[in-house]
């Protein structure tokens, strides 16, 4: 699968693999946010990491914000079922119920990489709870317990859903507003892998629409 990566994807692959291959080098970024519009190959990247690392005998934990999204991942599951986080609690009281001697705690200790797919639908409180439980399980105070973590998603597409929540509440609750998000090194994919000849102009227009930078039309 690595041979199929384009130039931008290969750059992302190498940046994420660096701290995995050099676990004692704390100067390397260990937390990443992978941004890219729909069709840029984010899902392909996640499964490439999974296949490569599992082929090396390493453990990878791959989770998503919804069960439908999780089906696109290699051995995927939802983040709330894996990390025992109640997604309906949207306050600072959100916690993980993982026990230190449980099977998932053992997997976390062994994991070379943790991937959270469609993290744009994850609450800031869930991210905070994840950061805390990783530190607790790994028994250190380094960001995310020194684990290599990749969050990914496109804020142009899917945001979290809050029952009866209005726009202000949704914006306040996204992971970008979590203090623990500052540890993430930004990675970007730009090339649309789904476009065919003659469709790039429309793909560019969709990105402009998603960025909110289309010219305003006065009626």
Where does each model-flagged region fall?
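Conserved ATP-binding/catalytic motifs of P-loop helicase motor domains
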Residues: 1-219
């Amino acid at each position: 699968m690595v041979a199929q990566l384009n130039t931008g994807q290969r750059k992302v692959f190498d940046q994420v693999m660096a701290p995995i291959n050099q676990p004692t080098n704390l100067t390397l970024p260990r937390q990443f946010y992978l941004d890219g519009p729909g069709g840029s190959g984010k899902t392909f990247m996640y499964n490439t990491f999974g296949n490569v690392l599992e082929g090396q005998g390493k453990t990878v934990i791959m989770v998503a914000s919804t069960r439908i999204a999780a089906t696109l991942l290699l051995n995927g599951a939802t983040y709330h079922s894996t990390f025992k986080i109640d997604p309906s609690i949207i306050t600072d009281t959100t916690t993980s119920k993982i026990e230190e001697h449980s099977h998932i705690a053992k997997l976390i200790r062994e994991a070379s990489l943790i991937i959270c797919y469609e993290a744009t639908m994850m609450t800031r409180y869930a991210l905070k709870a994840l950061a805390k439980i990783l530190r607790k399980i790994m028994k250190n105070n380094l960001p995310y317990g020194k684990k290599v973590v990749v969050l990914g998603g496109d804020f142009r597409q899917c945001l979290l859903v809050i029952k009866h929540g209005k726009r202000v509440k949704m914006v306040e609750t996204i992971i970008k507003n979590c203090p623990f998000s500052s540890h993430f090194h930004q990675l970007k994919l730009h090339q649309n892998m789904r476009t065919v000849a003659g469709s790039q102009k429309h793909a560019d227009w969709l990105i402009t629409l998603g960025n909110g930078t289309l010219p305003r039309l006065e009626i």
